[in-house]
């Protein structure tokens, strides 16, 4: 058993440090947080609770191309529950090495958010391509002012 552990541990850790060419998040899910409790991810606070009916995101690290689709991004609770409320635009944010001293973020341009909570983007990140090595990448849907509303889930590397 000890031999298996000695052989497998380096393999497991190496798998997370390889530079992937593409990362896909198969779902976009809303932030689950209590009112007035900042659910902080990579130093970025969340807003009030949101939900989605679907979505996905893809980042090609080699080409610096990002695409995302979010569907049904709406508030959960409050007077605007079930709608995007006053939010009319969102952006995608890639976070590389979250929480580490060498954390890097890359943002997309703002895109319109429909009254049904739908938005889509395809293009390049503002400020250049993401770093070649991006450990534990996170994908967030954010307000222009900075708070995150949703995150990529069910991540897969290619």
Where are these regions (language model features)?
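Sec-dependent signal peptide recognition
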Residues: 2-10
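Sec/Tat signal peptide C-region and signal peptidase I cleavage site
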Residues: 13-20
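N-terminal segment immediately downstream of the Sec signal-peptide cleavage site
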Residues: 20-63, 155-158
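Short amphipathic, basic-aromatic surface patches that mediate peripheral association
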Residues: 72-83
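Extended low-complexity, serine/threonine- and proline-enriched intrinsically disordered segments
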Residues: 81-100
